[in-house]
From Swiss-Prot:
KH-like domain residues: 361-445
InterPro entries the UniProt entry points to: G_ENGA (IPR031166), GTP-bd (IPR006073), GTPase_Der (IPR016484), KH_dom-like (IPR032859), KH_dom-like_a/b (IPR015946), P-loop_NTPase (IPR027417), Small_GTP-bd (IPR005225)
Lineage: superkingdom: Bacteria
Subunit structure: Associates with the 50S ribosomal subunit.
UniProt name for this protein: GTPase Der
Amino-acid positions noted as binding GTP 2 in the UniProt annotation, renumbered to this chain: 191-198, 238-242, 303-306
GO molecular function: GTP binding
Amino acid sequence: MSFTIAIIGRPNVGKSTLFNRLVGQKLALVDDMPGVTRDRREGEAKLGDLQFTIIDTAGLDGGPKGSLTARMQEQTETAIALADALFFVIDARAGLTPADRTFADFARRADKPVLLLANKSEGKHGELGAMESYALGLGDPIQISAEHGEGMGELYDALRGLVPETEDEVDEHEETDEERAARPIRVAIVGRPNAGKSTLINHLLGEERLLTSPEAGTTRDSIAVEIEYKGRGFRIFDTAGLRRRSRIEEKLEKLSVADALRAVRFAEVVVLMMDAQNRFEEQDLRIADLIEREGRALVIAVNKWDLMESKPGQISALRHDVDHWLPQVSGVPIVAVSGLMGEGIDRLMQAIVESYAVWNRRVPTAALNRWFEEAIANNPPPAVSGRRLKLNYITQTKARPPSFVLFCSRADAIPQSYLRYLINSMRETFELPGTPVRITLREKANPFAHKRKRPS
């Protein structure tokens, strides 16, 4: 089992910056405003030859019982319980605060190894603050700058005695189909604010891992959690709610939206979560269109279904709306769920697995050729300026999503309506519901184009 370290401390001392530094990529949102991190976030860290699991936490900050702030602290306490050691981070430039002293006592009571990290130690003011931190009684401070990467050598030396050595890694090799099938399916859950995304994931996990609240915008980072459901692994990203651009006012919310968009691009299947009490709005269409443009498989989950009084015909009406407004993902799976009550979870997970399979599908060449001949025989391409367009052949270039190249005589003259006909026919023939289908046009070279005409 991996050695686990939790990063703790008061808000805005640079915990998320240190987390990003150790995992080697910008996974956690970072901003000067305190309280950016709300949920605990895990990542695989590497420092030299040391490998360990790192947990970023919300800043330790008291609050009334049951409040969002208090529940953020509960998340931090859970992270401390899971950890084998702690990084206690202070802001050396700001010097010690009463909150630092209070939470140093909190760290001592955890009865686990604690490394005191004096962050932002660059410059004279930083050095003075680091010296002041001896008063916390947590040992010698390690002076670092998480933003600039300073002090990582000293941190490595301090960690060597704590983190157990890992076995030598096997030689890297190209991933096989079997290994790819064994990997967790990457799933992003997106939607308007307060649609119930975090509630659904908490039900899947069986614990309140992600903070939930009636207040829209509780989730800020894209939090990744790994689950196993009926023997299949999933890596699920909970994301911040996506509002219309005109409603995105705060700088932090803009960062959160950008983080959610990155999660969509990293995912393989995207679940668009909708509130059953607020039927399709323009923003839902925009989000679905974004998912299609990014080439991800789509599943629509209609949440809070337990609150609906009149249910008959609702899904059929929604299906009609989706197929009308989003023909580019015609046939997308639509599942009614209740994240709070756990209703419809099996159907949702099955829809994710099936959509992932469709997204990875390759059409056999012989079947593709038969379909192509029948499609153009049933509906030949139109004539343009009195000249018939010639479609030569089609080939699949890749999956994820299914993508094809169509060789033809005049690529610029083929109408978009005829391309839509081919895509819809292909989607129906090869059962490709809810996944983007790409057809790229390419002109077949004319072997006589380079020859000059004979003079008359």
